[in-house]
């Protein structure tokens, strides 16, 4: 594994000649002449005065604070001086309203300084959370290796966390763990690719692509909100369409899915993988998105065959991560509903699926940022309900919402699935029915069917959602929340 130096990070990622150091000469604690000699040798070997470099810079023209670990200085270990430097950098970034790009590379706490150095993890974490509480973006790029106290503080608190390919990332380095416990971890457990698959980090990106990723993220997170969109009235929407025809239309394999929506309508999309705490489920997509004039957090279901797309408890916890992220970054939320239903397995029941649905609905219904839910296709039961609460809801002309798939409702009422079409009609599942009952604010036309005009339809659906958000972002928060509450309270 080739280790990435501080110089390589600065020269590859930052705009040329824009880095300005914030560092002052470190004040080192007195742990005797042996430690002083170690520090002197580390400085001589690395040409650095501590294990971290901080400063201000531009990335793609965006002003940022930069914090980069230096493994060449005592294995990037964090003592009192390095921890103070990190803390001061976060505090300055917060005071100046700057996003932070941090790139840890560290063996952990500096053992020469013992417990006092270990306890500095607390103040670093406090400074990071104060920065996040100010609504400022925090991007993390983990380099090989990142372990111990660095990973367990500033390395794990980013809004977006990605890592170098093949990087060793873990709480305890493999050599120390094997000495302590007598056996190693299985091969690959502490590698960045494994952590991405498990939902601990958001992805794996080589250094040469980090600048592009950072610029995209900064564009989403710092660009002004000037949404543009298009409104559609109900005139021309067929009211005599059989509900079962809409069900069949949404199950057409050629019908656009979430990834088509993003491809045709998003200017930037940065996926966020998993919960960040070790769970990952691909049935829910969460990401930072830039639509024309509007940045948002998008949370959506990407319709696939039932066996691949049923909603699990972990998927709902992934969605909840998106809610929290939107609130912290003060970004609107757009949800996309298109699901065959919840996971119906022993694992889902034991995993608390019903409780996660309740918590997801409650969280989305009360989140303080503007929310628009979009019904792209199938709205099957509680899987749809989980992403439905919103200030405004737009629905594709063939979109629908039902407490169960019509076949399931038919099985309950008629003890056969053969009456599914009758149940679809009886349950008032169509977009026009949802509009009439107040569950939908606008129907987006399909001309004549989304499967026949995927690009145009996707752009219309997002134009409708962003037009709704243009009105919502202009409203005072408390007024908007009151209207949202009253909307569902008064629904008949």
Describe the residue ranges of each PLM region.
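Intrinsically disordered, low-complexity segments enriched in small/flexible residues
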Residues: 1-59, 63, 211-296, 300-308, ...
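Glycine-rich, charged/polar anion/phosphate-binding loops
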Residues: 50-53, 282-285, 319-320, 357-358, ...
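A structural preference for short, pocket-lining loop segments at secondary-structure junctions
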Residues: 57-70, 85-110, 289-303, 316-344
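Conserved mixed alpha/beta catalytic, RNA-binding, or beta-rich assembly cores of soluble enzyme
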Residues: 71, 79-86, 120
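Conserved acidic
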Residues: 74, 78, 206, 311, ...
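Flexible beta-alpha connector loops of hexameric P-loop NTPases
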Residues: 74-81, 113-116, 306-314, 346-354
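Conserved catalytic cores of soluble enzyme domains
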Residues: 106-227, 337-466, 470, 474
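A structural preference for long, well-packed, hydrophobic secondary-structure segments
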Residues: 129, 303-333, 351, 357-369, ...
């Amino acid at each position: 594994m080739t280790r990435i130096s501080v110089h390589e990070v600065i020269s590859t990622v930052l705009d040329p000649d824009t880095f300005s150091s914030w560092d002052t000469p470190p004040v080192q604690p007195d742990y005797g002449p042996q430690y002083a000699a170690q520090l002197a040798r580390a400085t001589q070997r690395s040409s650095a005065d501590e294990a971290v470099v901080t400063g201000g810079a531009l990335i793609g023209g965006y002003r940022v604070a930069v914090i980069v670990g230096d493994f060449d200085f005592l294995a990037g270990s964090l003592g009192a001086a390095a921890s103070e430097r990190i803390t001061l950098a976060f505090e300055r970034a917060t005071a100046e309203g700057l996003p932070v790009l941090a790139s840890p590379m560290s063996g952990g706490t500096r053992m020469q300084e013992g417990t006092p150095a270990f306890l500095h993890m607390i103040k670093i974490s406090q400074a990071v959370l104060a920065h996040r509480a100010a609504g400022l973006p925090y991007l993390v790029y983990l380099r090989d290796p990142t372990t111990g106290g660095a990973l367990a503080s500033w390395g794990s608190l980013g809004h977006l966390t990605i890592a170098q390919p093949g990087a060793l990332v873990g709480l305890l380095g493999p050599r120390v763990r094997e000495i302590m416990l007598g056996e190693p971890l299985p091969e690959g457990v502490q590698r960045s690719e494994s952590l991405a698959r498990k939902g601990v980090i958001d992805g794996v990106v080589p250094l040469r692509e980090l600048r592009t990723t950072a610029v995209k993220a900064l564009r989403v997170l710092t660009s002004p909100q000037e949404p543009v969109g298009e409104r559609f009235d109900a005139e021309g929407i067929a009211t005599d369409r059989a509900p079962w025809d809409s069900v069949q239309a949404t199950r057409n394999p050629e019908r656009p899915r979430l990834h088509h929506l993003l491809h045709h309508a998003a200017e930037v999309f940065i996926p966020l993988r998993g919960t960040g705490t070790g769970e990952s489920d691909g049935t829910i997509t969460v990401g930072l998105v830039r639509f024309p004039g509007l940045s948002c957090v998008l949370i959506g279901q990407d319709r696939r065959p039932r066996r691949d797309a049923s909603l699990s408890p972990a998927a709902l916890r992934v969605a909840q991560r998106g809610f929290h992220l939107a609130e912290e970054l003060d970004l609107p939320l757009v949800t996309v509903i298109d699901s065959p239903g919840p996971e119906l397995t022993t694992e889902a029941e034991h995993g608390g699926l019903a409780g996660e649905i309740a918590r997801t609905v409650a969280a989305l219904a009360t989140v303080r940022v503007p929310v628009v839910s979009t019904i792209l296709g199938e709205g099957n039961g509680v899987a749809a309900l989980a992403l439905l609460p919103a200030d405004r809801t737009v629905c594709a002309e063939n979109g629908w919402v039902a407490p169960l798939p019509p076949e399931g409702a038919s099985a309950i009422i008629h003890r056969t699935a053969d009456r599914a079409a009758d149940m679809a009609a009886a349950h008032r599942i169509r977009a026009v029915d949802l509009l009439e009952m107040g569950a939908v604010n606008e129907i987006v036309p399909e001309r004549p069917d989304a499967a026949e005009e995927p690009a145009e339809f996707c752009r219309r659906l997002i134009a409708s959602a962003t037009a709704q958000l243009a009105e919502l972002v202009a409203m005072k928060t408390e007024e908007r929340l009151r209207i949202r509450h009253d909307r569902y309270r008064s629904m008949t």
